[in-house]
Swiss-Prot record:
Subcellular location as annotated: Periplasmic flagellum; Periplasm
Subunit structure: The flagellum consists of an outer layer composed of repeating units of FlaA around a core that contains several antigenically related polypeptides. Interacts with FliW; a synthetic peptide of FlaB1 (residues 229-247) partially blocks binding of this protein to FliW.
Keyword terms: Bacterial flagellum, Periplasm
Biological function: Component of the core of the flagella.
Native source species: Treponema pallidum (strain Nichols)
Name of this protein: Flagellin FlaB3
Length: 285
């Protein structure tokens, strides 16, 4: 019988350390909800999980970018809707003035409203803003040095889309003319022929505005579809990442209970192993 080295006690002590470490890991996983808390838990799994997390966060931000872009489009379209109403009213006045029953004084009164409405078109264009950026003054036109509005709609590099918005000032729409008799540069309805020409000018302006609004509607529909696709992609990727990284709490609870029982059993056996050398004393008596 050996008394200098109690091999049974040493084995029980080593096994107790293993069981204690296993219990600590079980507690860590149960409290965090993650199967992988550090690279040592699963090195390859951690690498894949972190790559997926990067994509998920990128997709979520891209979704937010798209929603902000849709708000940008809706704001622009709202301003253009106001401009459309004004141009429609201008066209009514031009058709009214093109009727020969009105005197020069009557036309002058109509011209006052026309000039005010043209100024309002310019005011809308100059004050239409989103986050401090002018929308209708050509900042986002194809000819602009600043370039179009660019939305980043994906989780990776170069996944962006461009929004073009033409200039919608009164001048760009053709509402200024040198033919005015009242000293202004507004479109003039001072004569029947002048009013008739103005109708054509307004028709061209309406065509330009309607085309821009249609383009904005197409942009919005496209981005809404893109948002749904990104949301689905993020959801599926999150599910895949969860299967890699998240802990199966039921399984972890089973393991925790097993390791606790093993730990208690090991401590009991360690106590028994420590009593074995005492048998030598009985032999010496």
């Amino acid at each position: 019988m050996i008394i200098n080295h109690n091999m049974s006690a040493m084995f029980a002590q080593r096994q107790g350390g293993i069981n204690g470490l296993a219990i600590a890991k079980n507690i860590e996983k149960l409290s965090s909800g993650y199967r992988i808390n550090r690279a040592g838990d699963d090195a390859s799994g951690l690498a894949v999980s972190e790559k997926m997390r990067s994509q998920i966060r990128g997709l979520n931000q891209a979704g937010q970018n798209i929603q902000n872009g849709i708000s940008f489009i809706q704001a622009t379209e709202g301003y253009l809707a106001e401009t459309t109403e004004i141009v429609q009213r201008l066209r009514e006045l031009a058709i009214q003035a093109a009727n020969g029953i009105y005197s020069a004084e009557d036309r002058m009164q109509i011209q006052v409203e026309v000039s005010q409405l043209v100024d309002e078109v310019d005011r809308i264009a100059s004050q239409a803003q989103f986050n401090g950026m002018n929308l209708l003054t050509g900042r986002f036109s194809r000819e602009s040095a600043l370039g179009p509005m660019q939305l980043h709609v994906g989780a990776n590099m170069d996944q962006n889309e461009k929004i073009f918005i033409n200039t919608m000032t009164a001048s760009a729409l053709g509402f200024f003319s040198d033919e005015g008799t009242d000293g202004s540069r507004s479109i003039s309805i001072a004569t029947v022929d002048g009013a008739n020409k103005v109708i054509g000018t307004l028709d061209s302006a309406l065509k330009e505005i309607n085309k821009q609004r249609a383009d904005l509607g197409a942009y919005q529909n496209r981005f809404e579809t893109a948002y749904q696709g990104i949301a689905i992609a993020a959801e599926n990727l999150q599910a895949a990442e969860s299967r890699i990284r998240d802990a199966d709490l039921a399984q972890q609870m089973v393991d925790y209970t097993k390791n606790q029982i093993l730990e208690q059993s090991t401590m009991a056996m360690l106590a028994q192993a420590n009593t074995q050398p005492q048998a030598v004393l009985r032999l010496m008596q």
